[in-house]
């Protein structure tokens, strides 16, 4: 799968999530907690897959519209620890996704991407 296709698929899924789950929950006054949202797209597809960040943002804007989180928390796990966790998961299940199959440089780019996002949008 190309990086561009991955970007579009992730955001197609996110568009469905926003319309089918997030909007109704917000309309009902519920509190929502998502483990990943649009910053993940910027980090993984923009920085990790090295796609044009302006184009990535355009796709994100189309997918989520004006639905933006009130707060984003970033919890960074040192890469050696995340590598060990990934290896442990991989030993337990033979099925791996594209992110788990990516090389270490991909993980490093993703981490730097998250750090850049956090620096650009401090609380």
Task: Mark where each language-model region is.
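ATP-dependent small-molecule kinase phosphotransfer cores
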Residues: 1-64
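A glycine- and Lys/Arg-enriched "phosphate-lid" helix/loop adjacent to the NTP-binding pocket
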Residues: 42-113
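Post-transcriptional modification and biogenesis factors for structured RNAs
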Residues: 117
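Short, intrinsically disordered, charge-balanced linker/junction segments flanking boundaries
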Residues: 72, 121-123
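PAPS-dependent sulfotransferases, especially Golgi type II membrane carbohydrate sulfotransferases
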Residues: 96, 120-121
């Amino acid at each position: 799968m190309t990086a561009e296709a991955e970007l579009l698929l992730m955001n197609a899924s996110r568009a469905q999530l926003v319309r089918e789950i997030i909007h109704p929950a917000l309309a009902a006054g519920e509190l929502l907690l998502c483990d990943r949202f649009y910053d993940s797209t910027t980090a993984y597809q923009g920085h990790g897959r090295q796609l044009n960040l302006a184009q990535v943002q355009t796709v994100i804007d189309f997918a989520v519209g004006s639905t933006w989180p009130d707060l984003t928390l970033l919890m960074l796990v040192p890469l050696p620890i995340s590598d060990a966790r990934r290896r442990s998961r991989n030993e337990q299940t033979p099925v791996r996704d594209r992110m788990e199959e990516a090389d270490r440089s991909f993980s490093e780019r993703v981490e730097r991407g998250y750090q850049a996002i956090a620096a650009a949008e401090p609380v």
